[in-house]
């Protein structure tokens, strides 16, 4: 079914309006001529002809159908312009590209051409009745709303005198409560009634601009602000921050501002773990592996980004836990339904980390020290030259810990070594070191680029391995080391080609190398002693020094086009290629291989906004092309390498929609749906060389995700604010990927569960009084059940309708803080805070196996933390003290692996602007 050319659209004004704007405002998109330069190979020639034919067909169809339904209204045709597709056939150039991107043509270009053809074929034959019905219903509502629109849209961009975009600039209508803020790109959009208005543009540190306009049509107006050394009188308007706007969007998303807690925060994991519906389960102390779940879906079902680019680009071992918190402005958590603009195949959700975007030079440095020999140091800085637009941003983060906390009630040998007893020994081989250093340099505010940056980064981690996947498997000499280099180029241009169009492009390449050292013929115990063994510690085989080189290439292009104040289009292309070059220095039985997994993801989004922004709609579609090239053949009985072809290309299609309607500030409702696809990543398919076996026959996960939420902000009295949100969700997952533990070997493997259904509810409420007293509480319930009725042999499955094991299903958290202003000096403040986290007990294995009263379970946990922060000189200098787990509870997470007990930390931070 072709949605845009079916009879419904032809017989309504929707298609006519949409096509009129598209044809008249997109220069050369439908009227250009595509030429091919010499030197292109036949496959590239076919691609050119395919694209050219598609453009010509679209042009003819749009103009023909507009002519049928409008005889008097003519469409302004843009000047005819040639579009030249440059395809080089130079052999030397091909060789250089091939040596840098590895097999570029085989793994990237061919699947990309295949993807373009499959997009057209898939869309033409896809049958999604439920989605179409919802789509048509919302479009009908949109048609009704078009007649009710009597607002004029004033939009534009605010910059300083050097052309640098300014964020959080207020654009207000004088003598009214109407107003808005600019975003990170300096863009704004404000709806007003037709007529004459006076607009006030103001920002702290800049001179205020007042201008009067007589508006009867939509208008674009840019402003340039001049710096001011005098205080600017504030303009009172009702506006919303970017975090508030995102929370109130059509999709289910939480935003976490880092700035209020940056002085006491040591790791992003601490902040994210206090969010409703989100649970982080760590295997140990600082630097340990962790698993993050969103609404019951976890592991690699959740994707991580930094400024819209996959976090993997910094290195495979750069995570939320060791990313410098000084870099971060806020964290966006998408639940279940992920916008196509991120260009990902996430199934359960996504975490997008937004870095700081200060407009002036600054230095932000911090150092913390704590229990278990823990040290952290972070530096983030920015140096700007206002006249030239030159910007340099260095950053570095260092973490170190011995993690020598005590293990409670574990089996160990007595002093003579002749019998086993239970004791509380210290961890003795769990040291961790990480380094992340990066520098970014570029220019802003030029006519050819609003932002152009080149960056380079280096990350390194050294991790001693103390246990396997269970704590009874003790190591004493094994370790894992990794380092990664990254170079990237980022280009942003606002009003690209035409007014309202924004282009963002990123090219990134990472050289990632990890080594697992497992050479000791020893078996260790918790007392630190050992006996000589005939096998190495991790794999139980010959000594090994195993190398994994996983180069990562990322290409991301995002084109956003705001057609007017009510309609927008977003086109996103994302390519991700991960190599897997593995070999061993000692183990001659280990078979080297050079595998690769390449993904192409194309996303298209159409958004609407009506009734002064009260109603927002979003519709999106995603096309996925997966191209694995698997060459490893060893351990075929475990990995399934004898059951797959070496190189395959498969295509998948996803889609979704979202609707939000805000009745008034205290009450709003939103619903969203996505048919999502999640392709297995290299770590799941190919293992990690230490504790995870490969499984090359893994199937992609598919899920139908639904969210329904009520939320609102209520001001019961002056200086009092209450925010609440209640959310219900459904996740119907096929080929659910989860970990299977092989306890005898201390190994894990990712496997498919045919079907899992997850349903749940969550709620959160926040209270704020005058920015001083802040309270928060949330609770989450998740019911994940196995839906496989029969095994592969046809026999009934004993675990049918059982809860999925080893996953928290009921948990919650609470926070309280109070800030004293001007307590000792005029420009200081003292903040007292505490947090509480609770997790209900859950079974370690399937509840159908064994006796429910005696089978292993992870007990309920109650973790309390307290902190105090003192700041002076307008937050320039800050000292924070924290006690985590001050009740010294025994805390377990993954596979009953103990976490640290009571610990103390101190942090000093200085911010110079």
Residue ranges of model-derived segments:
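A beta-strand signature from Gram-negative outer-membrane beta-barrel systems
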Residues: 116, 222-223, 325-364
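Short, acidic, small-residue-rich periplasmic hinge/interaction motif at the N-terminus
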Residues: 159-161, 169-174, 202-206, 216-260
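Short acidic/polar hinge/loop motifs at secondary-structure boundaries
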Residues: 188-191, 309-336
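Extracytoplasmic beta-strand/coil segments of soluble accessory domains associated
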Residues: 269-310
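Periplasmic-side early beta-strands and strand-to-turn transitions of outer-membrane beta-barrels
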Residues: 368, 387-471
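Face-selective signature of the C-terminal outer-membrane beta-barrel domain
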Residues: 439-461, 480-640, 644-666, 672-674, ...
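Membrane-embedded beta-barrel scaffold of Gram-negative outer-membrane proteins
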Residues: 662, 670-674, 701-759, 780, ...
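Gram-negative outer-membrane beta-barrel transporters
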Residues: 723-724, 729-732, 751-843
